[in-house]
A protein has these predicted regions:
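Dynamic "connector" segments at or just before major functional cores
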Residues: 1-171
């Protein structure tokens, strides 16, 4: 039995007044279209915004091209899409679907990509707790991240469970 599509087009949330539409007629193809669904889910639960709030950005605002929420969102979405290596971001920084999901169709300044590359994201991932240094101007609050994981878990349930079992595998 052949598959039947009920719609020729599927519309997602607009980005900077532009329509984002999935068409099934064969035009430009991307392997990252799942990012649009992840982005819609994120907008409903606020994961990226809440996770980004666990970091402190000490960078000079007038010199920042990629804001903290964009950095965190780019990394979270890439991990969810299966891109676990930071080196992947030198290619992903030019991906129009990932950029649209993050609400960035283009960079604010000439010569920059819409999203960050591996070096900038490396500084985010290795953000130390405490005072900023020359190369680490983004810090994290480990306790806030731990609280967020618990909050997200509890938000996903109608009533808090009687018991939570953490099954940690050290292998």
């Amino acid at each position: 039995m052949p598959a039947e599509c009920s719609s020729d087009r599927f519309e997602f949330a607009r980005v900077a007044s532009r329509a984002v539409v999935a068409g099934f007629d064969g035009g430009t193809i991307t392997s990252n279209a799942g990012a649009l669904l992840l982005g819609a889910t994120d907008r409903s639960i606020g994961l990226v915004q809440r996770f980004a709030a666990c970091f402190v950005d000490h960078r000079a605002p007038d010199q920042v091209e990629h804001g903290l929420t964009t950095l965190v969102g780019q990394r979270v979405l890439a991990l969810a899409l299966g891109y676990e290596d930071l080196a992947d971001h030198d290619h992903l920084r030019h991906d129009p679907v990932l950029a649209a999901t993050m609400g960035r169709l283009a960079a604010r300044r000439a010569g920059y990509a819409a999203l960050a590359g591996k070096s900038t994201l490396n500084r985010l991932e290795h953000a130390p707790a405490g005072e900023p240094s020359r190369y680490h101007r983004i810090g994290h609050d480990g306790a806030a991240i731990e609280r967020l994981f618990v909050e997200l878990f509890l938000d996903a349930h109608r009533t808090p469970p009687e018991e939570i079992v953490l099954d940690l595998d050290a292998t």
